[in-house]
């Protein structure tokens, strides 16, 4: 999909006049008319150079030959020029590092007037760096035995970050096992005698306790350590042991650390600052030459603050080609700590509704905790935009920052101007966010004025994030997303690259549905509405487009997250044509209250868990979701059923990573940054889609299938030198049908090549699978590509010794004493949820008399479901689906052990059950009949047998019954293979 020129241009349908006007205004952010008009008008740029540059002079003309010496003077002159309102104003920054002693603040006085733009940009060929850090020099050995060096950096300041050779270094820390300590309402008691030395440490109030939990990553500073008692600072400890995923009751096994003591400095790459003495300690990494190290010690918490007031916002400002770097964020080291809740939000201050026994009574939520939600704070960004309009960041880099890279329209607490929200028509294009403590971009606030503003000018609207790269960031505040937007009206997140993140890739929405009209039943039960209104109007969150993004390797550290994550109602919003690969958990995650979203034509490859999941528990209103035409390598989807809760779920396709359809290949190729921002060719995302199909997909021994390779050019350029080859395993034959493609493919064109694939005449196993591989070589531009695809052909030896029946599509095979059933089926079971008798069976007709034993070994099971079943069966007539009585099975499952099931009322359905957990294939199973009674047994070795459950009486049992092998995949429409051996009836 090509990027739309504006956040919400739609290819089909009519647009209202008001909407058209809004789109045209937003489009101006991308058109960048300022530079062109300035040239035409002959307006001279204001040129500035870093401090100490030769010929730089604040009293000079501010030209390339005699640039200004300070950014302050450049800003003063830009303000004066902008105030005239006659032309665009450009400030050019020459190459070098501009070390700030205080943040740059841009307000209404810095704004472009009369439709003109004020641009702060890199001079041609320059890479200017705005830094809040100072370089560290003068290293000397501190401890030769441990390889620790030190440098004097000046006393009287603190920092939580050090950047070495362009990467954040790790503060000195030790790991603390959960068994080393006992958590208490005031801190913890040391249980491990090896930690007794903690009581002797100096500067104890500067020591941090970190708890890495499920979806929260928490920090609290120490107050004191005496003997084995550690007392933590307040309210940090109270707030971190309050609510959900709390330190004392995490949702998964926690990891604890103590940080920031000289004594902890024992690993290469760690550092410690003695702020009183002004001494920095560092232990170099292997191979790191301390004399060549580039170390930057940050002193500022923010670099650029763009914002005016709602009456006089900052306007018409553009920042282009700049690098923002070298900040810290000190708040987590205060007595507040970082009582993290989710995605950069944290509890701040003393909580008046916290009960005295909250350490136990509120460790997994309580009514008092609900009172905190409306006052949660947000992490402050290094670059901040609020109360501002027509602001653009283009081709810029945000790196080595102590918190979030760029905050747009966050709450007032996260803006140094003291005015939050109110960000309109802000665009971030072609920029890079990496190697920082916090997430990349955060749009919107989380407090009441963010979702139900008391002043309409507070609404965040018309935000565009496009062609950016956000990767390997949130290195300290692991709970933060690469891109996160809470409450915003008209937001486009298009064609960004997101990768290597600890938590979610792209997160949209906040509030868990509690602030939507009518509220949330779950939060009614929790008591939230005793502390806030139950709103009857929608929030400001609507009209969001998440389109064409490439998201990979996310959810690498934390949990309860996905490639794309949503919360609450987001009317008129779409998630389309994104490519998600290698998520550590989910693909699409529709969390509490997610509504009114559609997700179409996305590709999910290698998600560790479901490709899509909706949290619709506890009465929340999650629903009204549309999922159409998506592709996934993991078939699992939960909480989303077509026709339930207003959901539409159809035409989604499970694909093989080695054989993706051409349409999926196009989506993969087009995902991520576009045009000049696309970057180097990616061999994993080639401009040619190649897919293999087989007709039929399964053959008999000696049979043939037609395999077709379809090659489609999904790019806008020509593919040349196309060549296709196919290989098959030994014993199989491949014969080309027709002539090969000898020409290239124009943009959008496709071609096919076909082969006849023939299986060997017989096999030594019931089922043989052959990997048919196609290799396609071609060139596009100056780059050569090879695309490999494969599919599996299944060939079955004929079933000759037994009969077969399938109540659902099934195939059967045998070789020697081994058998295979390939079948699907919802289940073989009847209860209140429904009556199911869907299976495949091979059997001997009327083989079991009144005294009979049926035995077999289940050798193999596809894990189509934990309750898939394979084993032995007795039934009057195994072809009498849903009607024949005398029905009993003894089966093995992939995830629930073995089960003896029987028809207790003679209606033709299994309805009674006994089981033993922990048993998997291979395992032996047996049914023993004596008159009208049947018993089930299992064995792990074929000699020692264990009875399962009671002996069952089967009403309507016949004198002679069919006996055989039965299987069901317990997954409607999903075929599994089930193997058997040593079948016998006696």
PLM-predicted stretches and their roles:
Residues 315-326, 365-370, 389-400, 420-438, ...:
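Right-handed parallel beta-helix
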Residues 102-103, 301, 328-334, 380, ...:
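Short glycine/acidic-rich loop motifs that flank beta-strands on beta-rich extracellular proteins
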Residues 86, 761-772:
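Short glycine/proline/serine/threonine-rich loop/turn segments at secondary-structure transition edges
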Residues 1-40:
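Secretory targeting and sorting signals
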Residues 792-986:
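Extracellular glycan-recognition regions
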Residues 702-717:
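Short beta-strand elements of extracellular/lumenal beta-sandwich folds
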Residues 47-387, 392-399, 407, 414-422, ...:
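Extracellular polysaccharide-degrading/modifying enzymes targeting complex plant/algal/animal polysaccharides
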Residues 735-762:
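Intrinsically disordered, low-complexity Pro/Gly/Ser/Thr-rich segments with frequent PxxP/GP/PP motifs
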